[in-house]
Amino acid sequence: QRQHILPSIAHTDATYEEVEKANKAGYTHITHLYSAMSSVTRRNAFRHAGVVEAAYLIDDITVEIIADGIHLPKPLLQFVYKFKGPDKTALCTDAMRGAGMPDGESILGSLTNGQKVIIEDGVAKMPDRSAFAGSVATTDRLVRTMVQLAGIPLTDAIRMMTLTPARILHIDSSKGSLEAGKDADIIIFDNQINVINTISEGHVIYSK
């Protein structure tokens, strides 16, 4: 933590107690909340809380969600927003190379020996369509999803895409908001949250 390294809990079947121990050891973030991680399980007749429950009960844990409207449906997006809030929830694309590309075949991972996937219905799927194989969402889509599907205020959705992740990563001294002395990173979008201009450190790098 002194070196601003962010240890994160992800893709695990850990129990609540194990997450609690990890948190005391310095783990303060959870990657892709709900994706490939434990919730309430039953072991030898007893129920055990998992990573998901720990995310809500341990106050200093921050989370990120793949808010494409597919990995997490509307009720779960609303649940995370209601109980973790915009200051402890970051939006994450988790996008693979199929993002922004037409539907069809793609490869997850290495181009030489990676996993073949199918891009359709706004998400990457395994060839047999038995599971998701990654996201193809862009950041503007995440904001649109939170506003138009989950019904949260635009200002909170933007915060979850900008200042909150910057704070989690300890780079909010230069990123995450428009303030004197910070990098001039600006997105201009229309009423439907479609990107019109992208400005990076004061330079226009995209114009529609």
What spans do the regions from the language model cover?
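Short secondary-structure capping/turn micro-motifs that flank functional sites
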Residues: 15-17, 38-39, 71-73, 163, ...
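Anionic group-transfer/hydrolysis microenvironments
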Residues: 34, 96, 192
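Residue-level "edge-of-site" marker
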Residues: 13, 35, 69, 160, ...
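Active-site-proximal flexible loops/turns
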Residues: 39, 75, 101, 192, ...
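His/Asp/Glu-enriched, well-ordered alpha-helical/loop segment
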Residues: 47-65, 69, 76, 81-93, ...
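Histidine/acidic-residue-rich, glycine-tolerant segments that coordinate divalent metal ions
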Residues: 1-48, 100, 202
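C-terminal regulatory/interaction regions
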Residues: 174, 180-193, 197-208
